Amino acid sequence: MGRRNENCANSLRVSNISQENLSHWNLDSEVPVSENKNLPAGRDGAAGGKINKNYLEIPVEQLMLEPNLSVHSQKSTQNSKQGIFQLWNCPLNEGSTIEKREFKKSSVETGFNVINHPIRVFTLNHPLTIASVDKQVGPYPGLPMPLGLCWPYADGDFFKNRNEIHVSSCSTIENNDGETLPAPNWNLKHGNSSVEENFTDESDLSENEKTNDTLLSYFKKVDLNLKPETIKNVEEPFTEEPNEVFPYPDFLPPPFSALDLHNLALSKSDNWKVTVDPAETSVEHLITRLLELERLQHMTIQKERPRLQTTFCTPAVTERPSSSKATPKVRQPKLCDSLSLQIPCVDKSQEKSKNNSGSCKLEQNALKRNWSNAGKYRWNSRPLSLKSSSTPKQLIETYDKNPKSSILSPCQELSFKPTIGHTNQSMVKMVSTRCLPWRSPMPVSPIPLTFPENQKEEIKAPKRNFGTKKKLYRQNIVLNRPFSIQKLNCLSPSLIAKDKCCSPIEQK
């Protein structure tokens, strides 16, 4: 049996392993295996006698065997009286699923009792937790025990999604006769609370989630029994009566506080001195001052009453003009009154002339009038004086100098027989009143117009031709337009040159 142990070239001699000096055992390394090694059939490596263990990556951080054995080298192994434990690993076949780690004891030492030497195995992968498992292995004291530890999850992480660790020892016991006896299977459960807490630390949680969990656990422990504050209505509801008088302090002492200051203020005589006993000088001055204030208040009320009434009504012109520049404003309503009188008188003549002329189109035609035929007729007027006058004062002076050439009243015109010339003249005046704005920015002064005798014959002639009538209406309408509209339209220079010539009636 001693020769058998020497043939194992890949065995690891176990020395006194302390808890402080623990190394990481890389089981994934290639372990050279001798060809003369006694292995079962079908368990040799296929690639040049080397065994590749890619299927098992177990970083063993702490593995401590304390059977009180001191083994330093092969020479000391032969001289020692204690058993030699050799750890050797063999790969599995394709059909096999169990890896064995066997601790073999030489047959020279037969009196060694395994029960007295417990095996303490540290197999935790997590760096923060250390779980110790103390187990006395080997119920058969006189037999060599190759002991195999089975790790079903060989992925390098034994605590991933597992709350319990099962360590099963599927081992066989070889006796001197070569018989194999099954060793009892045993399970290890780590029920430590510290291990369970470290499982949660290894889970995939970010720092924010961990802080949130700690805060939630903190708030669950805190019991806040806050009661709402009861608001007491200390202030009483304010109910104001319609005839309630506020308790103002009295300025006067009690005998004089009963005086009716309003009535005494209206009466100019000093009756309060007669009714009341003579008071002190300070009180007398105070009473006189209060009476003056009452009179002043009464006067202001009377003065402000008409102003309050005028604000609700339309504003009326109550003051006279202070200068001559304001005279057009005074004369403007007179013109408006005369125009308002012309409107009802002209309406009657308008109804008679509807059959002979298109009176509905007069306003449109007046805006589209062509000034090419404007010089055929002469009229008795002074348009140049109106054009040259730029101020309302000059307009009023020219209007006052020619009072005879003003327009006749519509009532006198309607008193004549209803001839065509009179009806046309009334229609011209009616359209001129429509063209007048109600509130023009400049004072409106109608241009004086007198038709010559020859014009009547010319107006009678175009009865047969309806088109020439419209042209005559256009001319008459434009002649009697107000000055403000004529100024905007800007008369042509040819018409201005013809206006300089005066009619024979005006020369007389």
UniProtKB/Swiss-Prot annotation:
Intrachain S-S bonds: none
UniProt cross-references to InterPro entries, sorted A to Z: FAM217 (IPR029266)
UniProt similarity note: Belongs to the FAM217 family.
Alphabetized PANTHER family for the sequence: PROTEIN FAM217A (PTHR22145:SF4), SI:CH211-266K22.6 (PTHR22145)
Protein name: Protein FAM217A
Protein's organism: Homo sapiens (Human)
Taxonomy of the source species: Eukaryota, Metazoa, Chordata, Craniata, Vertebrata
Gene designation: FAM217A
